[in-house]
Amino acid sequence: MNMATFLRGFEEKGLKNDRPGDQFSKEKKKILFSFCEVCNIQLNSAAQAQVHYDGKSHRKRVKQLSDGQPPPPVQGSVPLLAGPCPCPGPGPNTSTGSACHTTTLPALVRTPTLMMQPSLDIKPFMSFPVDSSSAVGLFPNFNTMDPVQKAVINHTFGVSIPPKKKQVISCNVCQLRFNSDSQAEAHYKGSKHAKKVKALEATKNKPKMVPSKDSAKANPSCSIRPGTGDSSDKSEDKGKIKATSSSQPSGSEGGSFLLKSGTTPLPLGAIASPSKSTNGAPGSVAESEEEKAKKLLYCSLCKVAVNSLSQLEAHNTGSKHKTMVEARNGAGPIKSYPRPGSRLKVQNGSKGSGLQNKMFHCEICDVHVNSEIQLKQHISSRRHKDRVAGKPLKPKYSPYNKLQRSPSILAAKLAFQKDLMKPLAPTFLSSPLAAAAVSSALSLPPRPSASLFQAAAIPPALLRPGHGPIRATPASILFAPY
């Protein structure tokens, strides 16, 4: 008897009275072989059910049930009913029968248990929301935990930590952004940042020292009209200037630019520089340069930037700075002379260090240089330093011999060279042996002793060949058998 026929007969017997339609019978049939309660396995077809019921695992579980031992529980299984095994099996006539030899069971006993099984469409795990506040409440020390523990709890319970905003550290002076406090600290302590801050401070202080054109336009007291107008305009301007001078305090910055009554109008260039209008002495200019150098920590004469006032003082007391100051003033051994054709440039251009477009002469070393850069290089050279310190000159290395040569030796050498350069007679080269002898004699180096050259030079008659034919040397003979 086949398993499929058995299931069909079981369905006809069990569902004879309650068959509302074909669709309901198909569902019941599907439920019968869709699930095995003993092994808790879902079966999808009759052939799959036949193979499962004939297997060893199913027989073993059925044997355990028949002996009264409950099989090991399976997760998600439904408790078994008391009684014989609910799985169908072949009849007694079959050759390979199942261990469960029960015949048919009533449909009322078996159907409700099968109807209680979950269908294939139901998900085994259902997601349920977990409140984040409850998870934090479970862990009272959640805020003080390690970041690894927090990450594990967040992944498990879904606790979301609000993302922290990244702190942006930037330098508005240098237009830079930093990733950490250590980077920002290193930048603020650096020389580049300090130089830019000093340059900004210098630009802020400049409008206070020198009035700009806009401020001159805004303040009628500082604006001076040229003296080419009518007399009525001049009187009005003088009245305005007197009124403003009486209203402004004497200690204000703008008071130094006001004109006194009865003075002639000055050009705008004289008003723009307060140091010139107050005192034209060179001492005040030098003081202002020192003050600027202290503010900016920069020596405009030597073009050297320093980081502190102590470094600036050490530089000012150094020999290089003093030498440059002496070169500018012309008081030391280095004298400065104006370069030809550069007077117009000096008048039109800015002052600077006062050493532009000049030539310099070092009297100690007797050296002329053409620019300020060359002067600095010469001052820092070893030659100038040794001369200033009074050290003797070091001899320069030369590959040539510096022995003093006597005039007699030089005269003898010149006479011998002249004799060798004279044209020889044609009989001199009459034979190859004589030519070889002459060439070998000419190639000999002259002896250094002066005793050979005290007499007259060797006459050319001594170099002539002797009387009679001279036999030439025979050529070598090679023996070749083939």
Curated annotation (Swiss-Prot):
Comp. bias intervals (Basic and acidic residues): 231-240
Region (Required for induction of apoptosis): 1-105
Keyword Lipid biosynthesis: no
Chain spans, region Interaction with p53/TP53: 106-482
Zinc finger (Matrin-type): 34-64, 169-199, 294-328, 360-390
Region entry Disordered, spans: 54-75, 189-259, 268-287, 331-352, 378-397
GO CC entries: nucleus
Any Pfam family hit: zf-met
Record keywords: Apoptosis, Metal-binding, Nucleus, Repeat, Zinc, Zinc-finger
Subcellular location field: Nucleus
One GO term (biological process): intrinsic apoptotic signaling pathway by p53 class mediator
Molecular function (Gene Ontology), one example: zinc ion binding
Predominant location: nucleus
Zinc is among the record's keywords: yes
PANTHER family membership: DOUBLE-STRANDED RNA-BINDING ZINC FINGER PROTEIN, ZINC FINGER PROTEIN 385B
Stated role: May play a role in p53/TP53-mediated apoptosis.
Oligomeric and partner information: Interacts with p53/TP53; the interaction is direct.
The protein, known as: Zinc finger protein 385B
Organism: Mus musculus
Lineage: Eukaryota, Metazoa, Chordata, Craniata, Vertebrata
